Protein backbone atom coordinates (compact mmCIF):
# COMPACT_ATOMS: atom_id res chain seq x y z
CA UNK A 1 0.00 0.00 0.00
CA UNK A 2 1.01 3.61 -0.48
CA UNK A 3 3.26 4.16 2.54
CA UNK A 4 2.76 7.94 2.96
CA UNK A 5 -1.04 7.56 2.85
CA UNK A 6 -0.91 4.59 5.22
CA UNK A 7 1.18 6.59 7.71
CA UNK A 8 -1.14 9.58 7.41
CA UNK A 9 -4.20 7.41 8.05
CA UNK A 10 -2.53 5.75 11.05
CA UNK A 11 -1.75 9.17 12.51
CA UNK A 12 -5.32 10.39 11.97
CA UNK A 13 -6.75 7.25 13.58
CA UNK A 14 -4.37 7.60 16.55
CA UNK A 15 -5.33 11.25 17.00
CA UNK A 16 -9.07 11.06 16.28
CA UNK A 17 -10.16 7.56 17.26
CA UNK A 18 -8.01 5.95 19.95
CA UNK A 19 -9.53 6.53 23.39
CA UNK A 20 -7.59 5.28 26.41
CA UNK A 21 -9.46 3.98 29.46
CA UNK A 22 -11.36 0.88 30.54
CA UNK A 23 -14.18 0.03 28.09
CA UNK A 24 -16.49 -2.87 27.35
CA UNK A 25 -16.36 -3.91 23.68
CA UNK A 26 -19.37 -5.07 21.64
CA UNK A 27 -18.11 -8.62 22.18
CA UNK A 28 -18.57 -8.14 25.94
CA UNK A 29 -14.82 -8.26 26.52
CA UNK A 30 -13.07 -5.47 28.38
CA UNK A 31 -10.11 -3.50 27.05
CA UNK A 32 -7.85 -0.65 28.19
CA UNK A 33 -8.52 1.36 25.04
CA UNK A 34 -11.26 1.81 22.47
CA UNK A 35 -10.87 2.55 18.79
CA UNK A 36 -13.91 4.71 17.97
CA UNK A 37 -13.26 4.58 14.26
CA UNK A 38 -16.37 6.57 13.33
CA UNK A 39 -14.38 9.62 14.42
CA UNK A 40 -12.02 8.84 11.53
CA UNK A 41 -14.38 7.27 8.97
CA UNK A 42 -16.57 10.39 9.17
CA UNK A 43 -13.59 12.79 8.94
CA UNK A 44 -13.10 14.40 5.52
CA UNK A 45 -9.41 13.50 5.07
CA UNK A 46 -9.41 10.12 6.82
CA UNK A 47 -12.46 8.99 4.84
CA UNK A 48 -10.73 9.73 1.53
CA UNK A 49 -7.64 7.82 2.66
CA UNK A 50 -9.76 4.88 3.85
CA UNK A 51 -11.51 4.68 0.49
CA UNK A 52 -8.27 4.65 -1.49
CA UNK A 53 -6.39 2.30 0.85
CA UNK A 54 -9.28 -0.18 1.09
CA UNK A 55 -9.55 -0.24 -2.71
CA UNK A 56 -5.81 -0.84 -2.95
CA UNK A 57 -5.95 -3.56 -0.27
CA UNK A 58 -8.68 -5.41 -2.18
CA UNK A 59 -7.67 -4.56 -5.75
CA UNK A 60 -7.29 -8.24 -6.69
CA UNK A 61 -10.89 -9.02 -5.66
CA UNK A 62 -13.34 -8.28 -8.48
CA UNK A 63 -16.38 -7.11 -6.51
CA UNK A 64 -19.28 -4.98 -7.74
CA UNK A 65 -20.79 -3.97 -4.39
CA UNK A 66 -19.42 -3.24 -0.94
CA UNK A 67 -21.07 -2.98 2.47
CA UNK A 68 -21.53 -4.46 5.89
CA UNK A 69 -23.41 -4.31 9.14
CA UNK A 70 -24.67 -0.87 10.08
CA UNK A 71 -23.37 1.46 11.58
CA UNK A 72 -19.62 0.95 11.52
CA UNK A 73 -19.44 -0.35 7.96
CA UNK A 74 -21.60 2.39 6.42
CA UNK A 75 -18.99 5.17 6.09
CA UNK A 76 -16.31 2.63 5.10
CA UNK A 77 -18.48 1.34 2.24
CA UNK A 78 -19.30 4.84 1.01
CA UNK A 79 -15.62 5.84 1.21
CA UNK A 80 -14.76 2.89 -1.04
CA UNK A 81 -17.66 3.69 -3.37
CA UNK A 82 -16.49 7.31 -3.78
CA UNK A 83 -12.76 6.56 -4.09
CA UNK A 84 -11.21 6.90 -7.55
CA UNK A 85 -11.39 3.83 -9.75
CA UNK A 86 -13.96 1.59 -11.29
CA UNK A 87 -17.63 1.99 -10.32
CA UNK A 88 -18.52 0.17 -7.10
CA UNK A 89 -21.93 0.45 -5.45
CA UNK A 90 -22.71 0.16 -1.75
CA UNK A 91 -25.26 -1.47 0.55
CA UNK A 92 -26.10 -1.55 4.25
CA UNK A 93 -27.09 -4.60 6.29
CA UNK A 94 -29.55 -3.69 9.03
CA UNK A 95 -29.27 -5.37 12.42
CA UNK A 96 -32.86 -6.54 11.91
CA UNK A 97 -35.30 -6.26 9.02
CA UNK A 98 -37.67 -3.30 8.99
CA UNK A 99 -41.19 -4.10 10.12
CA UNK A 100 -42.74 -1.53 7.77
CA UNK A 101 -42.26 -0.36 4.20
CA UNK A 102 -40.39 -2.94 2.13
CA UNK A 103 -39.22 -4.77 5.28
CA UNK A 104 -35.71 -5.17 3.92
CA UNK A 105 -32.67 -6.43 5.79
CA UNK A 106 -30.28 -5.12 3.12
CA UNK A 107 -30.68 -1.53 1.89
CA UNK A 108 -29.07 0.15 -1.09
CA UNK A 109 -27.65 -1.72 -4.06
CA UNK A 110 -28.91 -5.22 -4.76
CA UNK A 111 -26.51 -8.01 -3.84
CA UNK A 112 -28.30 -10.96 -5.46
CA UNK A 113 -26.11 -12.51 -8.15
CA UNK A 114 -23.27 -10.05 -7.48
CA UNK A 115 -19.71 -10.38 -6.20
CA UNK A 116 -19.54 -8.66 -2.82
CA UNK A 117 -16.91 -7.25 -0.46
CA UNK A 118 -17.99 -7.13 3.19
CA UNK A 119 -16.31 -4.40 5.24
CA UNK A 120 -16.00 -3.28 8.86
CA UNK A 121 -14.47 -0.27 10.51
CA UNK A 122 -12.86 -2.09 13.46
CA UNK A 123 -12.79 -5.88 13.84
CA UNK A 124 -12.72 -7.58 17.23
CA UNK A 125 -14.38 -11.01 17.05
CA UNK A 126 -15.58 -10.89 13.44
CA UNK A 127 -19.19 -11.40 14.49
CA UNK A 128 -20.46 -8.20 12.86
CA UNK A 129 -18.77 -9.05 9.58
CA UNK A 130 -20.05 -12.62 9.69
CA UNK A 131 -23.60 -11.37 10.35
CA UNK A 132 -23.30 -9.29 7.18
CA UNK A 133 -21.73 -12.20 5.26
CA UNK A 134 -24.66 -14.47 6.14
CA UNK A 135 -27.23 -11.82 5.20
CA UNK A 136 -25.55 -11.27 1.82
CA UNK A 137 -25.32 -15.01 1.16
CA UNK A 138 -28.98 -15.52 2.10
CA UNK A 139 -29.87 -12.72 -0.33
CA UNK A 140 -28.00 -14.50 -3.14
CA UNK A 141 -24.75 -12.53 -3.14
CA UNK A 142 -21.30 -14.09 -3.50
CA UNK A 143 -18.97 -12.82 -0.76
CA UNK A 144 -15.37 -12.67 -1.98
CA UNK A 145 -13.85 -11.66 1.33
CA UNK A 146 -13.90 -9.37 4.34
CA UNK A 147 -11.76 -6.26 4.80
CA UNK A 148 -11.49 -3.96 7.79
CA UNK A 149 -9.79 -0.68 8.46
CA UNK A 150 -8.43 -1.66 11.91
CA UNK A 151 -7.92 -5.22 13.15
CA UNK A 152 -7.67 -5.52 16.94
CA UNK A 153 -6.00 -8.98 16.63
CA UNK A 154 -8.57 -10.55 18.95
CA UNK A 155 -9.93 -13.36 16.80
CA UNK A 156 -11.71 -11.74 13.85
CA UNK A 157 -9.24 -13.01 11.24
CA UNK A 158 -9.44 -16.56 12.57
CA UNK A 159 -13.26 -16.54 12.77
CA UNK A 160 -13.68 -15.20 9.24
CA UNK A 161 -11.04 -17.48 7.73
CA UNK A 162 -12.70 -20.45 9.52
CA UNK A 163 -15.76 -19.67 7.37
CA UNK A 164 -13.60 -20.07 4.26
CA UNK A 165 -13.28 -16.36 3.50
CA UNK A 166 -10.11 -14.33 3.08
CA UNK A 167 -9.62 -11.48 5.56
CA UNK A 168 -7.52 -8.34 5.22
CA UNK A 169 -6.94 -5.18 7.23
CA UNK A 170 -5.40 -1.81 6.46
CA UNK A 171 -4.10 -1.16 9.99
CA UNK A 172 -3.22 -3.29 12.99
CA UNK A 173 -2.60 -2.45 16.62
CA UNK A 174 1.13 -1.89 16.07
CA UNK A 175 0.31 0.79 13.46
CA UNK A 176 -1.63 2.64 16.16
CA UNK A 177 1.00 2.24 18.87
CA UNK A 178 -1.24 -0.20 20.73
CA UNK A 179 0.47 -3.50 19.98
Swiss-Prot record:
GO MF annotation list: magnesium ion binding; orotate phosphoribosyltransferase activity
Pathway assigned in UniProt: Pyrimidine metabolism; UMP biosynthesis via de novo pathway; UMP from orotate: step 1/2
Alphabetical UniProt keywords: Glycosyltransferase, Magnesium, Pyrimidine biosynthesis, Transferase
Pfam family, one: Pribosyltran
Domain of life: Bacteria
Record bears the keyword Lipoprotein: no
Record-listed E.C. numbers: 2.4.2.10
InterPro entries given in the database record: OPRT, Or_phspho_trans_dom, PRibTrfase_dom, PRTase-like
NCBIfam families: pyrE (TIGR00336)
Function per UniProt: Catalyzes the transfer of a ribosyl phosphate group from 5-phosphoribose 1-diphosphate to orotate, leading to the formation of orotidine monophosphate (OMP).
Xref: PANTHER family: OROTATE PHOSPHORIBOSYLTRANSFERASE, URIDINE 5'-MONOPHOSPHATE SYNTHASE
Subunit-level organization: Homodimer.
Record protein name field: Orotate phosphoribosyltransferase
Species: Mycobacterium avium (strain 104)
Name of the gene encoding the protein in the UniProt record: pyrE
Amino acid sequence: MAEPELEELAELVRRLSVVHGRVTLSSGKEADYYVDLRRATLHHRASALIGRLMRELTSDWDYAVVGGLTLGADPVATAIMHAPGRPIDAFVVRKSAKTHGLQRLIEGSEVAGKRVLVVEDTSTTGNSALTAVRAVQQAGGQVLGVATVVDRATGAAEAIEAEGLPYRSVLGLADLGLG
